[in-house]
């Protein structure tokens, strides 16, 4: 079994935001950036770029991008913008995406939510080596599962995703017909110059090249550059773990762990007046695909219309019911598909409800043909009820039941703890790579109980290569439609049981998609004991899966 040792990162480093230097380049990562490059200053009439597959080339390169009026930042992009192009393919097509790296650092592409073959999953040090500057790599898979997915770099992903290396992947079902079909990628950025300077200064500390577990140099590298996670056991049930056990960061002074530093929110890489209107005609059947590519949850409210949530994480909801004036809470990594009929002419907001000042910019406008004056009122601080997905849609028998017989059962206790003034995020009291993997064989039926024991942190847990069915929440069976997902958010104190079939052999990550948490330990693996990979990590490449 191959494992990759994650970087042990200081708290300040964990929260660096390299994407967001407003006026100057102060890091080695951008030392080759040409300040005279063309600025990406699209107007509000420029749509999200779409690449219709099945063969696509993505070029990773540095650019500057106008996020809002007066805010231009250096970004890392696919094909010159963040987000990168929306890749649209049809069910049944054989997809071929060639990644060319023109950046100064290695990159990769992970197909978030889509069950690709293991060697196409894009995890440096686990399924492939990161693609070095000047090199290329081709990803190939069949698009057999329609839905809303997305792609992003999984090399040093806590930073590269923040820098802008992501885009949407849409697998179209040819039987579904919509007059308008829009994808909205949600993200957050930092614009405060002093905060940016502090973050960028901290970037140079504690950076560790992650090596495979068998590398003899790993320990030496860790000792020189930062804390070594290996051998650390902080199980809250162990008496000898001392003050480390159960110590939640909410009770600690932790510099930089203030997510309000993300003060500018974007939709498709734009904020405020630069967000592209969603143009419709009266009578249109409209689909909105909402993708959270950021690190904060967003409570999205569609004004002026009765809507249905028809899918979550690309998987359909059974007989969804009409709702109005409720927010849909979308956690990092999650996707929600919304459908409505355009039957209320005018201009209407689609907005985030949040106390964070960045929410002012996370607004799109549903704009009917011929409409002129905006009469709708923005209300990002208004309190609305949240849609409870555990009771939404019509109940029916899913692939699994709560009390059926399972081949394997596992528990995952998620926590925020301290070790020698370092914040770490643990599963069963340990950090990766010392967390025991979930071991399966092809065909196994697997049930996992997840409990969030952190006092203040959400943990959006993402399983690679598989879909799971949500069976229960806080001990109560799901009352509505079967819920099938690949990313599930656990708020403090919450408990879920999920089940999946081991039908995609490989070595798969199961981790928190607040990548700050993943980079500080909250990662495990689902390993097939009857699978053997041909991949051997190149020890000369600094593979950093988180």
Which residues make up each language-model segment?
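Histidine- and aromatic-rich segments of cupredoxin/plastocyanin-like copper-binding domains
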Residues: 120-123, 127-132, 142, 186, ...
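C-terminal motif of bacterial Sec signal peptides marking the signal peptidase cleavage site
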Residues: 16-19
């Amino acid at each position: 079994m191959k494992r990759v040792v994650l970087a042990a990162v200081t708290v300040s480093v964990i929260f660096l935001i390299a994407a967001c230097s407003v006026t100057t380049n102060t890091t080695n990562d951008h030392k080759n950036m040409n300040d005279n490059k063309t600025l990406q200053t699209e107007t509000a009439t420029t749509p999200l770029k779409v690449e219709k597959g099945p063969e696509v080339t993505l070029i990773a390169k540095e650019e500057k991008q106008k996020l809002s009026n007066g805010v231009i930042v250096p970004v890392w992009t696919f094909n010159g913008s963040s987000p990168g192009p929306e890749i649209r393919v049809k069910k049944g097509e054989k997809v071929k995406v060639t990644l060319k790296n023109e950046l100064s650092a290695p990159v990769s592409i992970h197909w978030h939510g889509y069950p690709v073959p293991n060697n196409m999953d894009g995890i440096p040090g686990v399924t492939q080596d990161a693609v070095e500057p000047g090199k290329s790599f081709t990803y190939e898979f069949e698009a057999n599962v329609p839905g809303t997915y997305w792609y992003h770099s999984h090399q040093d992903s806590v930073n590269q995703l923040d820098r802008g290396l992501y885009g949407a992947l849409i697998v179209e079902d040819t039987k579904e017909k919509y007059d308008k079909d829009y994808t909205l990628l949600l993200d957050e950025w930092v614009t405060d110059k002093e905060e940016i300077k502090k973050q960028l200064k901290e970037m140079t500390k504690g950076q560790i090249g992650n090596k495979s577990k068998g590398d003899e140099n790993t320990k030496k590298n860790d000792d020189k550059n930062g804390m070594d996670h290996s051998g650390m056991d902080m199980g809250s049930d162990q008496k000898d773990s001392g003050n480390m056990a159960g110590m939640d960061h909410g009770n600690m002074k932790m510099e930089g762990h203030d997510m309000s530093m993300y003060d500018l929110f974007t939709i498709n890489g734009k904020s405020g007046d630069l967000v592209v209107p969603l143009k419709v005609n009266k009578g249109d059947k409209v689909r909105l695909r909402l993708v959270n590519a950021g690190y904060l949850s967003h409570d999205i409210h569609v004004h002026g219309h009765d809507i249905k949530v028809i899918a979550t994480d690309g998987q359909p909801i059974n007989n969804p019911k009409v709702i109005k004036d409720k927010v849909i809470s979308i956690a990092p990594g999650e996707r929600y598909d919304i459908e409505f009929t355009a039957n209320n002419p005018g201009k209407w907001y689609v907005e985030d409800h949040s106390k964070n000042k960045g929410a002012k910019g996370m607004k799109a406008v549903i704009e009917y043909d011929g409409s002129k004056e905006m009469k709708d009122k923005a209300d990002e601080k208004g309190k609305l009820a949240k849609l409870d997905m555990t009771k939404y849609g019509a109940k029916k028998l899913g692939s699994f039941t709560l009390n059926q017989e399972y081949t394997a059962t596992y528990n995952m206790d998620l926590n925020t703890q301290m070790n020698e003034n370092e914040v770490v995020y643990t599963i069963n009291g340990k950090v990766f790579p010392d967390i025991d993997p979930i071991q399966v064989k092809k065909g196994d039926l697997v049930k996992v109980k997840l409990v969030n024991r952190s006092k203040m942190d959400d943990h959006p847990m993402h399983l690679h290569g598989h879909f799971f069915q949500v069976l229960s929440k806080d001990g109560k069976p799901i009352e509505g439609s079967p819920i099938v997902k690949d990313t599930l958010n656990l708020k403090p104190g919450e408990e879920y049981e999920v089940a999946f079939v081991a039908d995609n052999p490989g070595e798969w990550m199961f981790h928190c998609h607040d990548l700050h948490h993943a980079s500080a330990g909250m990662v495990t693996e689902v390993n097939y004991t009857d699978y053997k990979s041909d991949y051997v990590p190149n020890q000369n490449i600094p593979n950093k899966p988180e």
